[in-house]
Swiss-Prot record:
Residues 1-41 are annotated as: Disordered. The capsids of autonomous parvoviruses expose a proportion of VP2 N-terminus and part of that sequence can be cleaved of to form VP3. It comes from Canine parvovirus type 2 (CPV-2). It is found in: Virion; Host nucleus. The lineage of its organism: Viruses, Monodnaviria, Shotokuvirae, Cossaviricota, Quintoviricetes. GO terms for molecular function: metal ion binding; structural molecule activity. Disulfide bonds join 490-494. Keywords: Capsid protein, Clathrin-mediated endocytosis of virus by host, Cytoplasmic inwards viral transport, Disulfide bond, Host nucleus, Host-virus interaction, Magnesium, Metal-binding, Microtubular inwards viral transport, T=1 icosahedral capsid protein, Viral attachment to host adhesion receptor, Viral attachment to host cell, Viral attachment to host entry receptor, Viral penetration into host cytoplasm, Viral penetration into host nucleus, Viral penetration via permeabilization of host membrane, Virion, Virus endocytosis by host, Virus entry into host cell. This is Capsid protein VP2. The keyword Magnesium applies. InterPro entries: Capsid/spike_ssDNA_virus, Parvovirus_coat, VP1/VP2.
């Protein structure tokens, strides 16, 4: 298969062998256009973003990305089923949210994951995209490994010992592309473990692991609960055992020094992603009331007046036992956003989990209890945006505040009695300040959910640079409407995960019966990875008189985008949906 070939469901990738001949001359790269072999480059390093302006306001965006990837041999050649147990923390009343207990399969493979915006776009690219375009369509994806180098490490007998590095022309790099998505899907952006965001800095793939079924019970408690919390292991249900190995499920290709590997092209089937936000809440839908009296002079204290008595107005409501028509009671066409139990932890047979909700800005974002919005909070290290000269292990963190404004303000919610009466007495209305179950500081908006068939939702925004780009559709009969981690959800199939592993490089002392650990020569690899991600975008047209806010720099943040005097760099998150649009 040559470069640019279509990668169908179940299609096999292309492997180009570029080993040197006895004379030292390399063979021609299959489709790559360059010669190969030891000491001869066989590929190109390209991190340019190309914008091709088409007809009718469309733009084709080709994002090229290249990285030098370093890979050590695995600690063990074995698959391991590992239980993570922190019952010492959850044994204390009120500590349910500290629960980390789970079981995972740790594999000897590593995952090359490019599924994050920062892998593909620099801040300048992102500025051009969000300032000039209104929507993105995800078109295609391809990736390649080339210029493979494998080296062995030995130590001299001198004191102190000296490490010696030698090229090993017969060692192998194992590469597997799961084009059928047979393996568990494990996007690494949720752990900030994708390829790094700086093209000039080497990066590493993440060790590949996946969840294994494990039942347990954790009974909720608070600090005043008497007795020790119930925390019980139940083990693995034999009906649910699924142990996957790459070696017997995915074709594995063996590359040696100078070899290349190409996946071919995957074409996406996804709905487009908007680069605009909506501001209309339910109070801004439809025709406003007619004003009988308009202001006669300028000034913020001069108001208009509806004029008609509230119980004599015309219109439609869903309020029984009253004739009052107000901006609060008139019937709106649908529910924009929804009140979500945004600090709700659900219980599952494998432990508690925070309920995911769709992000959407709530009010002025002044106080935590006004933000019923699910804005994602990212923690990341020096490969993914933290200042590269930072010392210590504490990650950097940002909260991405989505621009989609659902207008939620939980402090102002209330529930009326039936039949509706005005004014209401204390036993006719439930306010956020009313205690539930004798508790204070908890109101019904923590448990109240207005999601339903009348709910209007925006998809999640692109989060630059740390956010995930695409996600895999659930294999269920009923599909979720949005996925909260990524704006693009692949229908039917998504790009196959790319796995790599340094093959076992054995010594003459290997005895399969002697030990579970192989006697191996210390071997590592580095190789060049490159990819191409293609989008189509629609140029944004202006339909308003006023100019709008756009992404820019100023005197306060200009140095976020340039290195310090010792090379310190960081990447700050950027808004992706600055331009407003009406939704009705």
């Amino acid at each position: 298969m040559s470069d640019g070939a279509v990668q169908p469901d179940g299609g096999q990738p292309a492997v180009r062998n570029e080993r040197a001949t006895g004379s030292g001359n390399g063979s021609g790269g299959g489709g790559g256009g360059g010669s190969g072999g030891v000491g001869i480059s066989t590929g190109t390093f390209n991190n340019q973003t190309e914008f091709k302006f088409l007809e009718n306001g469309w733009v084709e965006i080709t994002a090229n990305s290249s990285r030098l990837v370093h890979l050590n041999m695995p600690e063990s050649e074995n698959y391991r089923r590992v239980v993570v147990n922190n019952m010492d923390k959850t044994a204390v009343n009120g500590n349910m949210a500290l629960d980390d207990i789970h079981v995972q399969i740790v594999t000897p493979w590593s995952l090359v994951d490019a599924n994050a915006w920062g892998v593909w776009f620099n801040p300048g690219d992102w500025q051009l995209i969000v300032n000039t375009m209104s929507e993105l369509h995800l078109v295609s994806f391809e990736q390649e490994i080339f210029n493979v180098v494998l080296k062995t490490v030995s130590e001299s007998a001198t004191q102190p010992p000296t490490k010696v590095y030698n090229n090993d022309l017969t060692a192998s790099l194992m590469v597997a592309l799961d084009s059928n998505n047979t393996m568990p899907f494990t996007p690494a952006a949720m752990r900030s473990e994708t390829l790094g965001f700086y093209p000039w800095k080497p990066t590493i793939p993440t060790p590949w692991r996946y969840y294994f079924q494990w039942d347990r019970t954790l009974v909720p408690s608070h600090t005043g609960t008497s007795g020790t919390p119930t925390n019980i292991y139940h083990g693995t249900d034999p009906d649910d055992v699924q142990f996957y190995t790459i070696e017997n499920s995915v074709p594995v290709h063996l590359l040696r020094t100078g070899d290349e590997f190409a996946t071919g092209t995957f074409f996406f089937d996804c709905k487009p992603c908007r680069l605009t936000h909506t501001w209309q809440t339910n109070r801004a839908l439809g025709l406003p009331p007619f004003l009988n009296s308009l202001p006669q002079s300028e000034g913020a204290t001069n108001f208009g007046d509806i004029g008609v008595q509230q119980d004599k107005r015309r219109g439609v409501t869903q309020m029984g036992n009253t004739n009052y028509i107000t901006e609060a009671t008139i019937m709106r066409p649908a529910e924009v956003g929804y009140s979500a139990p945004y600090y709700s932890f659900e219980a599952s047979t494998q432990g508690p989990f925070k309920t995911p909700i769709a992000a959407g800005r709530g009010g002025a974002q002044t106080y935590e209890n006004q933000a019923a919005d699910g804005d994602p909070r990212y923690a990341f290290g020096r490969q993914h945006g933290q200042k590269t000269t930072t010392t210590g292990e504490t990650p950097d963190r940002i909260t991405y505040i989505a621009h989609h404004d659902t207008g939620r303000y939980p402090e102002g919610d209330w529930i009326q009695n039936i039949n509706f009466n005005l004014p209401v007495t204390n036993d006719n209305v439930l306010l956020p300040t009313d205690p539930i179950g004798g508790k204070t500081g908890i109101n019904y908006t923590n448990i109240f959910n207005t999601y339903g068939p009348l709910t209007a939702l925006n998809n999640v925004p692109p989060v630059y640079p740390n956010g995930q780009i695409w996600d895999k559709e659930f294999d269920t009969d009923l599909k979720p409407r949005p996925h909260v981690n990524a704006p693009f959800v692949c229908q039917h199939n998504c790009p196959g995960q790319l796995f790599v592993k340094v093959a076992p490089n054995l010594t003459n002392e290997y005895d399969p019966d002697a030990s579970a650990n192989m006697s191996r020569i210390v071997t590592y690899s580095h190789f060049w990875w490159k990819g191409k991600l293609v989008f189509k975008a629609k140029l944004r047209a202006s339909h308003t008189w006023n100019p709008i806010q756009q992404m820019s720099i100023n005197v306060d943040n200009q140095f976020n985008y340039v290195p310090s005097n010792i090379g310190g760099m960081k990447i700050v998150y950027e808004k992706s949906q600055l331009a407003p649009r009406k939704l009705y």
